[in-house]
Amino acid sequence: MKPLYDFSTLPVDRTLAPRDGMVAGDLTEQYFDLGRRALELIHFSSVLCDKPHYPEILDLPCGHGRVLRWLRAHYGYAKITACDLDRDGVDFCAQQFGALPVYSEPDLNQLHFPQQFDLIWVGSLVTHLNHDRWLTTLDCLVKWTRECGVIIFTTQGRCYTSLLARGQRNVTENIDKPALLEEFARTGFAYQKYFEAEHGDYGVAVTSPEWLQRTLQRYPDIIMRAYLEEAWGMQDVVILYKKAGHYEPALGVPEMNRVAPVPTPATRYGFIDWLLGR
C-alpha cells in the first residue's frame, strides 16, 4: 500500500536495542517501515474517529520500540505506556523514549493500569493466542479504553492463510498448517501451537472478517470504524471506537462467545478439500 501520510521529516530516534529480536540481518529498513506504517494507521484512526489528540497511549506489546519510537516522535506531549512480557524491551522503551514502564502478565486479567487510555495500539499479539486468550485480550482492551477512546489491533486473515494454502515458504513452518487451514475454513477462527512450544500455549491464530464482526457484537459500547486487509505487512488492521451504549445489547453479554467457534457453511461445498489441494 502507498504511504497514507508523509512522515519523512519526523525526528524519529533510530537507536536499536542490542536484544531487539525484531531486527535480524538486512531487515532493519523493514523494521522501521513497519513502525512508520503503524503511525500512519494511528494517524488515520485519529481522522476517522475525530480524535486530534491522544494524551494517554498504551503500546502492547511494545517490544523494543518498533512502533513506540514513532509514537514518541509524533505525539511528543503524550504519556506513553510501554508494556510487554519482555522486560528488557520495556526497560529500553522507558530509558530511550521516555515511556512509562509496565511489565505485562501472561494472564491479562492480572494486569492493572492506574488509568484508562485514549489510544491502545496492539501490533501482532492476538495473532499468537488461542481462542479463550484471544477473547480475554479483547475484553481487557475494551476495559482499559476510556470513553471515546480508540483501539487498533492487527490480525491474520485471508492474506496469511492464502499464502499458507499456496505453499508459500518462509511464512510459518513450525505449525500444523493443514489443521490450521481446515479449522479456519470451517469456523473462521483457527489456532495452532508452535511445535517447539512444549511448555506454553503460543502459536498462530487466524481470524476471518466475518468471525471478528460476529465477535464484536458482544460489545454494545464498541463501534468498528475500519477493517483494513493487508494494511500492516501481511496482517489486517482493525480500528475500534468506544462509545457507551451506542448499540443495544441484543446479542448477549461478553460470555456468549466462550464456546467453540460455530462452523460455517463452507464445508458443505468441499471448500476445505479445495483449499488443501485434496
Where are these regions (language model features)?
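A conserved beta-strand element that flanks and buttresses the S-adenosyl-L-methionine
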Residues: 121
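Short catalytic micro-motifs in class I SAM-dependent methyltransferases
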Residues: 124-125
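Secondary-structure boundary elements
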Residues: 117, 147-148
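A short glycine-rich, Lys/Arg-flanked "PGG" loop and its adjoining helix->strand segment in the class I
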Residues: 135-147
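Local beta-strand N-terminus motif with an aromatic residue
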Residues: 54, 117-118
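Conserved S-adenosyl-L-methionine
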Residues: 61
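ABC ATPase nucleotide-binding domain "signature" loop
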Residues: 128
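Class I (Rossmann-like) S-adenosyl-L-methionine-dependent methyltransferase catalytic domain
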Residues: 1-56, 64-112, 131-133, 152-276
